[in-house]
Amino acid sequence: METIFALATAQGKAGVAVIRVSGPHAIEIGEKLTRRTLPARGMIFSKLKDSAGEILDEALVLSFTSPDSFTGENIVEFQLHGSIAVVSAVMSAIEETGVARLADPGEFTRRALDNGKLDLTQVEGLADLIDAETEAQRKQAQVILAGTLGDLADRWRTDLIRAASLIEVTIDFADEEVPVDVTPEVKQLLSGVLHDIEKEVDGVAIAERIREGFEVAIVGSPNVGKSTLLNALAGRTAAITSEYAGTTRDVIEVRMDLAGLPVTLLDTAGLRETDDHVEGIGIRLAQERAERADIRVFLAEEDESFSIQMREGDLRLLPKADERRSAKGAISGRTGQGVDDLVSRISDTLRNRTAHDGIATRARHRETMNRAVLSLRQAIEVVEQGPEFYDLAAEDMRSAIRALELLVGRINVENLLDEIFSSFCLGK
């Protein structure tokens, strides 16, 4: 196994930079640069020198010996001043030792996976934690990174192996009298795992929205204040506003943190009949995005109707509260009237929905768990038909077990790993 190194912090000028080295020669490299013996697991403060003895910097040097490290290999980390010149000099000194190469993106984490320090779901959790923009995303990623989904999958797998072993024993003694009917215990094990997995599958859709973000579309006729409201919600000028109808012709997106949840606000083209080809394209796009949005905020008069039908959770408000005698049920992006109340209502709706999220967060999780669900349903049906069909039930159970192994990355995930690790930085 080669020794690898990389800058683990962001490139550019900073107060502190961290360079990570992992592999069989990591300790050797640390001792060459410090001219000192490193502890098996500890930290020293030392000058760093190149091969000619020139002082490059003073640094905290952390050392971890295999297997008690992030990658499961020997690791040395140099915490030094974040000068671009200092980082470049230390990186060059490491390369000049001739026993290490620059890491590929995500290679440290790949080694942690290969060495059993993380499972695939934890790798995905780490990627999500790095990308987290809101508190809800951070909490969600931490749960996955802690191994919660992997632990669940291992528990399900253990129960299925137990059920399969009972079936296999019965098959092996098919010509003899088996003293105990294993059918009740097998059905109980299979039904329990099936119930748990189905519950997780039901929560994936909401969990995915937390990870990827919710969409809230502002919908209405032209010139009712949609863009002004978007700007008020965003706290900045994100959309052009004017007194002329049809100013907005494209969907304008603003990403924001709404009570800890990731939300993308959509300002859409005004809905109306038009002979303008470009405006017509914008209106069709507005309708498509509004149909897919999690919540639609309709700015409309009481007697107005649209081709887009309201759904549960959608909100309908009267526009331009500042121009009305009675502002009840109305909102104004220009004055801010009703904006705080709208934010609260959107937040409450989304929080109520996220109360039913699951641990699994990705389409991949849902797909592999659905494979297991299908196999388990078939296994239960076959078991109920009697011992003469146990060999078919055993194959269904093995299929369910393989699906769970795929979930945590034990089998057939090379292409997926390449995709995941390509999004990591060099030092991760």
UniProtKB/Swiss-Prot annotation:
Its EC number is 3.6.-.-. Gene3D superfamilies: P-loop containing nucleotide triphosphate hydrolases, Probable tRNA modification gtpase trme, domain 1, tRNA modification GTPase MnmE domain 2. Keywords: Cytoplasm, GTP-binding, Hydrolase, Magnesium, Metal-binding, Nucleotide-binding, Potassium, tRNA processing. GO terms for cellular component: cytoplasm. Homodimer. Heterotetramer of two MnmE and two MnmG subunits. PANTHER family: TRNA MODIFICATION GTPASE GTPBP3, TRNA MODIFICATION GTPASE GTPBP3, MITOCHONDRIAL. This is tRNA modification GTPase MnmE. It comes from Ruegeria sp. (strain TM1040).
